[in-house]
Amino acid sequence: MEQTFIAIKPDGVQRGLCGEVMKFIQPMKHYLDLKDMPFYAGLCKYMSSGPVFAMVWEGEGIVKMMLGETNPADSKPGSIRGDFCINIGRNIIHGSDTVENAKMEVGLWFKPEEFVAYAEKAKAWVYE
């Protein structure tokens, strides 16, 4: 079972999309891998401009499919970005791109004791 880090970005929060997608931010650390990109300063400013709704999702290879492509124009209907995004600069949601990055990003935002472990009964009926 894979985990990935998910953050609804400020435009998604401001547009009231947290419920549709199901004031704590560390943009400088979170996007450190992009620090040499020309858009880095603007991205950090944007990610600090309002609250972010952070969470961890778990599933078998479905997270990227549910999010859609980074560019909403390339996202399929039925994905979060395909249904709710306006443009690439305001694509409402961040999702880890690899399992390795997910572990790092989850560690930036959450402490291990903040997770609640529970056995979902339906899981045995859905996953082999």
From Swiss-Prot:
GO terms for molecular function: ATP binding; metal ion binding; nucleoside diphosphate kinase activity. The modification N-acetylmethionine is found at M1. GO terms for cellular component: cytoplasm; lamellipodium; nucleus; ruffle. Keywords: Acetylation, ATP-binding, Cell cycle, Cell projection, Cytoplasm, Kinase, Magnesium, Metal-binding, Nucleotide metabolism, Nucleotide-binding, Nucleus, Phosphoprotein, Transferase. Its main location: cytoplasm. SUPFAM superfamilies: Nucleoside diphosphate kinase, NDK. Gene3D superfamilies: Nucleoside diphosphate kinase-like domain. It is found in: Cytoplasm; Nucleus; Cell projection, Lamellipodium; Cell projection, Ruffle. Its cofactor is Mg(2+). InterPro entries: NDK-like_dom, NDK-like_dom_sf. The keyword Nucleotide-binding applies. Pfam families: NDK. It is an enzyme of class 2 (transferase). ATP binds at K9, F39, T70, R81, N91. The active site is at H94 (pros-phosphohistidine intermediate). Major role in the synthesis of nucleoside triphosphates other than ATP. Belongs to the NDK family. This is Nucleoside diphosphate kinase B. The gene is nme2.
